[in-house]
């Protein structure tokens, strides 16, 4: 196949890509393209998740659904599970490889929509230079050749209710400034382990993604081949490190700001991950666990641990019904699991029915994007696109 002009240009750059071809099941709604080692996963605009086929709850629109958790297996391997979950999944997803002089090699996942929202559009137009260069600065999962893995999750913030300032810069005057997502690949190329990544991040002026209504902070879950892991969070113009913290969703976990978790989202996902992580003994187990926190599950009242509406404001109804006494530690320990489930089964029946109706009637869709299982010791990324569980890609150096 003839290479697009823009792709020929990039063969000269430190991004390893080759000719365009397609793979996957033609009967599925998921369209997949491969640019050499780069994967383009393109769900059609009308696609909904296979497993549940649920429409999105309109109250959820604009929320984030990403989750990540790590564990050192009995064989010593550091394994991280990650779901990249947004309220849309029509964006093309790319796997990017970089090999830059005096930097570590990386493999990472990115997405964008400049050149189209379907494989057909991109095949017809080619992949533009603008698209590919933008992807480099929105690589939200990265593994490098030393076994350092970093994944980025957004935080939901409402400054008017929390007093959290928009993160316009953590280190004004620093030689280097970059946005929250751009830091992921940069640290992967420059750092060999978690300690180096945390220290280097603090020398950079990192700023958040800001709109008129929200000041989005974020968190990076980092892990390396030594088994060291933790969460670095961007909040209030600060970078705060929580050492040996094993998971993140879309609320703050550091001790200084965790009381602001009620305006984030993901407590139900967080609870499920931590209540089952001890049973994870392999990469396959981790992949199975991550499937349980996809939004097609969380938004189905028959399968979620917390009422779906609780995801709108983090603790939501579960938090309020416990008189504000439900904490991250309680969810982590599973201490009140039976009480929470009983409460949801009984007192939340009407809310569940209302949510089911919204799921059926709302024209918008919630579509998961991808799931990653990273092995820091083998330096591998296993990527599954939620729209087709049987379509899995394994990447290594």
Predicted regions and their residues:
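Aromatic- and glycine-enriched pocket-lining scaffold segments that form the walls
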Residues: 194, 198-231
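Outer/extracellular conduits and scaffolds centered on Gram-negative outer-membrane beta-barrels
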Residues: 11-15
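C-terminal, well-structured catalytic/ligand-binding subdomain of enzymes
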Residues: 27-126, 134-136, 141-142, 153-189, ...
